[in-house]
UniProtKB/Swiss-Prot annotation:
It is a multi-pass membrane protein. The keyword Ribosomal protein does not apply. Keywords: Cell inner membrane, Cell membrane, Membrane, Transmembrane, Transmembrane helix. It is found in: Cell inner membrane. The keyword Iron-sulfur does not apply. It comes from Aliivibrio fischeri (strain MJ11). Belongs to the UPF0761 family. The lineage of its organism: Bacteria, Pseudomonadati, Pseudomonadota, Gammaproteobacteria, Vibrionales. This is UPF0761 membrane protein VFMJ11_0098.
Length: 310
């Protein structure tokens, strides 16, 4: 019994070492910074596209404001008033754009989804890319069906709330508790879907669940910690004043992408049994892929730092 425990502890330790090497190898913090930059460029266009899709259906009238408020209040800790005011101002300005400008908004939204696709497939060492038509169909489905599913869930929530059975105190208390857990359930479901569907590779459901659970826990802890930091150490407000919402939003988006990519690394590494049992980084990735990634992020080391070149 004791030997089995020691064996499992050794396997667990070797896995943690492998995961650490994998994270360093994949330049996770650099990738998170790149994704945060793309997200900030595409965030307002993406929200605008989602709200415009919802506005096309009378049954979802008013759902856009509800979705926007729910996301900001539950997924952007602290500083939500400043961030919400800035986002609403940006989104209201997009209503003055022409058809050509609206087309660019759609392109910017696709850029974000495409960047997510590339980053996660890199973590999974996927060499075979999806066909362009398939990728476009996938992105189009996300931008159209996504808002409809959100609107449908809001309509269902409103319908359930209006039922007479909700007058019962016990049922009403249970329903409020369920709504309180809704942000956690949504974030966990989003992580599972992300790790299962985005990689162009078969991913085991158990691995995706473990990665999503890890990312979900980190996300909830980071929300509490980030909110405490913002409220207890308001240095951003002192330095930036009215513009404090911009760096606060950037830091939070960067932290979110670190969490998303860590969950992806955990999910992908669990599928590499031979690699992490040996305690080595997977060698499936090509050197050309490494060079392409470093060139993209501007982090190529000079030849003078290469010991073999001396």
């Amino acid at each position: 019994m004791e030997d089995k425990i020691k064996h499992k502890l050794r396997i667990g330790w070797s896995y943690l070492l492998f995961l650490k090497q994998r994270v360093i190898h994949d330049r996770l913090t650099v990738s998170a910074g790149y994704m945060a930059y793309i997200t900030l460029l595409s965030l307002v266009p993406l929200i605008t596209v989602l709200l415009s899709v919802l506005s096309q259906f009378p049954v979802f009238s008013g759902a856009g404001d509800t979705v926007q408020a729910f996301v900001i209040q539950n997924f952007v800790p602290a500083a939500s008033d400043a961030v919400e005011a800035s986002l609403k101002e940006f989104i209201s300005n997009t209503g003055k754009m022409t058809a050509v400008g609206s087309g660019f908004l759609f392109v910017a939204s696709v850029m974000l989804i495409s960047s997510i696709d590339r980053s996660l497939n890199y973590i999974w060492r996927v060499k075979k890319k999806r066909r362009p038509m398939y990728s476009f169909s996938l992105y189009w489905m996300i931008l159209t069906l996504g808002p409809l599913l959100v609107g449908a869930s809001l309509a269902a929530t409103s319908y359930v709330t209006s039922l007479k059975i909700m007058d019962d105190e016990i049922v009403s208390s249970f329903y409020r508790t369920l709504l309180g857990w809704l942000p956690i359930i949504l974030s966990f479901s989003a992580f599972v879907g992300l790790y299962l569907l985005v990689p162009n590779k078969k991913v085991r459901v158990t691995h995706a669940l473990i990665g999503a659970m890890s990312a979900g826990c980190l996300f909830e802890f980071s929300k509490v910690g980030f909110a405490q930091y913002i409220t207890q150490f308001p240095s951003y407000q002192v330095i930036y004043g009215a513009l404090a919402a911009v760096p606060i939003l950037f830091v939070w988006v960067y932290l979110c992408w670190i969490i998303v990519l860590i969950g992806a690394e955990i999910t992908a590494s669990l599928g590499e049994f031979e690699g992490w049992l040996a305690g080595k980084v997977s060698t499936n990735i090509l050197e050309s892929d490494i060079k392409a990634l470093t060139e993209q992020q501007g982090l190529i080391e000079s030849d003078s730092t290469d010991p073999e070149s001396k």
